């Protein structure tokens, strides 16, 4: 059964695929060249450029690596503004995370 994605996620994947294609074309690389260098099939490259959700993140990273853009993935969620606000609010409220049980180990 195919996974149902949120519309925004589908749009983001589609834009991501378009960006991959544009980056490939700017480098004057064919799908076949990228596929060979990434160790993927041409049909997988085509699916990624269409923003397919069925392609593994590892394959997307291989594609990015061939384009010299693989480190850009590290920027994702690096500045988690909402998460930091939630963490700060928890610290201000004085609540602490529950203690972990010591499972017979000594420090």
Predicted regions: what is each one?
Residues 28-46:
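Short alpha-helical DNA-recognition segment
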Residues 52-65:
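Short, basic-rich loop-to-helix N-cap that marks the start of a DNA-contacting helix
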Residues 74-107:
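Short, charged recognition helix plus adjacent turn
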Residues 24, 35, 64:
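The alpha-helix within a helix-turn-helix
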């Amino acid at each position: 059964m195919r996974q149902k994605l949120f519309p925004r996620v589908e749009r983001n994947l589609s834009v991501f695929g378009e960006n991959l294609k544009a980056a490939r074309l700017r480098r004057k690389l064919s799908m076949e060249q990228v596929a060979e260098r990434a160790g993927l099939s041409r049909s997988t490259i085509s699916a990624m450029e269409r923003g397919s959700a069925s392609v593994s993140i590892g394959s997307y990273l291989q594609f990015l690596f061939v384009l010299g853009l693989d480190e850009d993935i590290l920027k994702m969620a690096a500045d988690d503004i909402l998460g930091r606000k939630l963490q700060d609010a928890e610290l201000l409220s004085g609540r602490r995370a529950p203690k972990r049980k010591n499972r017979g180990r000594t420090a």
